[in-house]
């Protein structure tokens, strides 16, 4: 059913409207009276009139149609009210009431009953445990806020975060199209709201704060289309163990893995930020028409700010644009002899409005972002330069205003939709987020397991180490030469056939921490084989002998995330996977270009290219792609290849652990 009755209702009933002005039901009613031009119906079984309006004892007594019912009653009455809504033919409902899934099993059962009742009448429910929904046309929340009409939609899974964003929007004069507080997402899910807003002609960008995702598969299916229509920016609560625990008691959501969430946002083409200030700063870009690029020219009247900004640009992986000689020649004509025509372009501390104007005229056609920093000084004010920048709208201008009149300068630029900041580092981070936006991808998960792989893994909770190596070979992943032995003579024969030196290690049906058990011996030569076998066979009767390879040790793994499903992991291998923690995540299945990006993100690509030998990165990429499909094909719960040794001959799975 359409979400129009929720977002654009023709009539609204407030169930639980109160005569007490401190009660939520009264606040919502007064907010609607102040902002909504449609029909409003207060519902209270003990009142005849509230806030000068006729009150009805139940929804069923209302004479006209009701598009939207906002319910703010004690939770024990919520189901009864929803039954009335079904009988009345209400189309949508916002359930403000809390005390449902977020407080435990009893609340969860009540929430299920509430939603099953609503479904009988085809009622779409926002919440429960929500602050509500607000737009320039109606305030269906208990927040005291009148929003300015704008093009940014805010979707939040926290009433407190939502209230702060409303305050921020008013304080910064930021217009919004909608703010939606999702609450427990018992019915209407975040992906549905994102999809609806992506089709809304009054919304240019969507900003989303989430603590958990209701349905990972649906999210991965729906949000790529939304992100292809307009920017969708995400921030997530529950990044740490403590934060994830707080999420459970806040909205009853499963926080899931923070790193997997980030990978999911990359997959759907969203922009992911890690702190609230950057999240809100991006609003200054997404509604701007400025063509923002990752190549940056810094124009400033402060050498120190130029240095700090250059550092920030370098740390962000962005580029400082080279100034062409012809433009340098023009700049020399306006610069003092103490200033050089280079990037950052220091106009000197005595630069006034005119020097800024002359410099901007010269550099305006450079194909880059012009990051213009103004430190307010006696010879120049931020506001004066802000007015200069208005002449270069559409030329990729970003203003950074620093000084006593920075607020008025920011207002001048913002009124013209030119991105404006009061710190250059914040501007640089916003540029990085915007220019590194990934392309949306839809993940098609069709299990196509190889029959021999199915036979090998059927009915098992885990694979023995030698079975895991066989599975690698079935899927075309290289392994070192190897063999399993159970006697000294067999060990000698297998080692001779492999060639020296070899690695000898304990082997068992269950996955073992072999190194911790002192069950791995490297650099075994011919005359050592029998004695090493005797040593290892004291731990396990079965011993594995492998060809000893040299190369870069890489970690490739997989897991089944409870929210987003199968995910592939890449990072430094051996002991360094725990020490460096430079692991990149990708939602399965990944494609070769995504695998390469994962290698770059985890720094494994840099490690490979730093080697003098031509290590086979292509083989590693193909292995990552294969693993990402294997874990889907066989529904693998956990998988580690550590190490996967990469050298000039390919990528070789040395130790493999697989759990189902």
Protein language model annotation of sequence segments:
Residues 1-660:
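Catalytic-core regions of core metabolic enzymes
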């Amino acid at each position: 059913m359409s979400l129009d009755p929720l977002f654009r209702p023709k009539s609204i009933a407030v169930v639980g409207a109160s005569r007490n002005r401190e009660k939520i039901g009264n606040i919502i009613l007064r907010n609607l009276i102040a902002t909504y031009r449609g029909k409003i119906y207060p519902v209270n079984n003990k009142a005849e009139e509230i806030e000068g309006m006729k009150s009805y004892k139940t929804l069923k007594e209302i004479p006209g149609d009701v598009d939207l019912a906002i319910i703010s009653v004690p939770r024990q009455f919520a189901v009864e009210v929803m039954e009335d809504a079904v009988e009345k033919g209400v189309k949508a409902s916002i359930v403000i009431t809390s005390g449902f899934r977020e407080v435990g099993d009893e609340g969860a059962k009540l929430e299920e009953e509430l939603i099953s009742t609503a479904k009988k009448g085809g009622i779409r429910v926002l919440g429960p445990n929500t602050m509500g929904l607000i737009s320039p046309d109606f305030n269906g929340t208990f927040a005291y806020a009148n929003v300015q009409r704008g093009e940014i939609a805010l979707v939040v899974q926290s009433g407190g975060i939502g209230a702060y964003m409303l305050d921020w929007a008013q304080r910064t004069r930021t217009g919004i199209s909608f703010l939606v507080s999702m609450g427990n997402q018992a019915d209407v899910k975040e992906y549905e709201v994102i999809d609806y807003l992506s089709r809304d002609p009054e919304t240019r960008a969507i900003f989303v704060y989430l603590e958990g995702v209701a349905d990972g598969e649906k999210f991965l299916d729906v949000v790529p289309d939304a992100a292809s229509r307009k920017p969708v920016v995400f921030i997530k609560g529950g990044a740490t163990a403590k934060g994830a625990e707080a999420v459970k008691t806040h909205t009853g959501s499963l926080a899931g893995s923070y790193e997997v969430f980030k990978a999911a946002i990359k997959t759907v083409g969203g922009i992911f930020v890690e702190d609230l200030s950057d999240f809100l700063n991006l609003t200054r870009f997404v509604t701007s028409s400025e063509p923002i690029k990752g190549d940056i020219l810094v124009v400033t009247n402060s050498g120190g700010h130029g240095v700090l900004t250059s550092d920030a640009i370098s740390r962000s992986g962005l580029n400082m644009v080279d100034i062409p000689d012809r433009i340098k020649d023009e700049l020399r004509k306006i610069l003092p002899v103490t200033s050089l025509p280079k990037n950052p372009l220091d106009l000197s501390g005595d630069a006034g409005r005119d020097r800024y104007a002359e410099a901007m005229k010269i550099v305006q056609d450079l194909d880059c972002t012009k990051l213009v920093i103004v430190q307010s000084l006696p010879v120049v004010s931020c506001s004066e330069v802000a007015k200069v920048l208005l002449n270069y709208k559409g030329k990729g201008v970003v203003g950074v205003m620093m000084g006593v009149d920075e607020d008025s300068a920011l207002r001048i630029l913002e009124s013209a939709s030119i991105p404006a900041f009061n710190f250059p580092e914040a501007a640089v981070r916003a540029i990085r987020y915007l220019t590194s936006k990934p392309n949306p991808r839809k993940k098609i998960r069709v299990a196509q397991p190889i029959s021999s792989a199915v036979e090998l893994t059927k009915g098992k909770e885990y694979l023995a180490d030698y079975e895991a190596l066989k599975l690698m070979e079935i899927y075309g992943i290289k392994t070192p030469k190897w063999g399993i032995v159970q006697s000294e003579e067999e060990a000698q024969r297998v080692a001779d056939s492999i060639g020296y030196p070899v690695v000898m290690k304990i082997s068992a049906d269950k996955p073992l921490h072999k190194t911790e058990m002192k069950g791995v011996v490297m650099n075994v030569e011919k005359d050592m084989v029998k004695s090493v076998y005797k040593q290892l066979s004291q731990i396990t009767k079965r011993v594995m002998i492998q060809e000893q390879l040299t190369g870069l040790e890489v970690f490739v793994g997989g897991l089944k995330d409870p929210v987003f499903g199968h995910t592939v992991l890449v990072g430094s291998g051996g002991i360094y996977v725990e020490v460096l923690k430079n692991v990149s995540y990708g939602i399965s299945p990944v494609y070769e270009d995504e695998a390469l990006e994962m290698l770059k993100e985890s720094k494994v690509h840099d490690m490979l290219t730093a080697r003098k030998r031509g290590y086979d990165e292509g083989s590693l990429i193909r292995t990552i792609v294969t693993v990402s499909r294997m874990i889907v094909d066989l529904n693998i719960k956990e998988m580690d290849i550590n190490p996967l040794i990469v050298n000039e001959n390919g990528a070789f799975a040395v130790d493999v652990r697989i759990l189902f």
